Amino acid sequence: MRHILSMGADKVAINTAAIKRPALITEVAEAFGSQCMVLSIQAKRSRTWPGKWEAYYDNGRAHSGYDVVEWAKRGVALGAGEILLTSVDCEGLQQGMDLELIKAVTSAVNVPVICGGGVGCGDDIVDAAQAGADAVACAAVLHYKKETVQELKDDIRAGGVEVRKV
């Protein structure tokens, strides 16, 4: 961790290690500041708990048994300064983000939440921002050249959300 930060990283997102050893969140926050500790949460709709999501780890393959909203709150209480929230159910589909998930997590924590999974166009980013996302991560929409960064930014701006000019 120290090496990564010394190479110029401002933040480090941790998922699997945090689930396996939650005290790591506090250790990182105390050593480097909570602004550096980003809790990465990979969320899947739960088959066990209707209307809820379960946190996964190991690249979305392993069940944690943690309710996502409760895990986000616990992570913040332990020292996480941001949440990187990914909907595994929507990831790569480019059909919109899980707005219910975004609302549930952003209303439960008082730290910035970066949301990912499902962006197919600029309107999806606008919807996520309106649902409470502080920032949006997107990949497939750009990897598969469905839209350019400039087109996304134009759509986002047209939707009334502030975005830095290219």
Q: Across the structure, where does each feature detected by a protein language model lie?
A:
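Internal alpha/beta core interface subdomains
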Residues: V69, K73-P112, V126
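Conserved anion-binding
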Residues: R2-L85, D89-C90
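Generic beta-sheet signal
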Residues: N15, S40, G116, C138-A139
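Electropositive phosphate-/nucleotide-binding environments in soluble metabolic enzymes
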Residues: I19-P22, G65-V69, G96-L99, G122, ...
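Short, loop-centered acidic/histidine patches that primarily coordinate divalent metals
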Residues: V88, G118, A139-V141
